[in-house]
Amino acid sequence: MRKKAVTVKQIQDLDKVAIEKVGIPSLVLMENAGRAVAQEVFKRIKGIKKPRVCLLCGLGNNAGDGFVAARHLIEGGVKASVFLIGKGSGLKQDAAVNYQIFKKLKYPIKEIGARQPLPLEEVRAADVIVDAIFGVGLNREILGPFRNMIAAINQAGKKIIS
């Protein structure tokens, strides 16, 4: 069966219509997206005793989806390792809101700076990796710790949800 794909512009237009014309707050869209990611992870780890999930978040709104997914996974009893590539102070808008919610719940999150080692052990030990580093709007070359992290994810040979 052939599946149709949507373009970046179509996705952005759908978000814009949902927010501006329908009136769905962007924070609600992020919550729904993150919950959907968590539900997909739950499907993929079904039957695994003590599943481990590694969530890798960038600094854009995609990170917010990752924080929401991580919250739902942790609340569902999953051991989730959450990494932010950068500093929490670099997050904006809805991603920053969900980062603060995550922190207020005292869930662990590790910030990875340019000079810090990548969490390769956690990536390799995970049953599922959630890539919340970049979203559909990425339009530049990927450099530095982001590039290295993506290479590590691809080499891990694990189930990846992005």
Task: Name what the model sees in each region.
Residues 2-6, 46-58, 62-162:
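Glycine-rich phosphate/dinucleotide-binding loop and adjoining beta-alpha-beta core of small-molecule
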Residues 1-50:
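Positively charged, low-complexity intrinsically disordered leader regions
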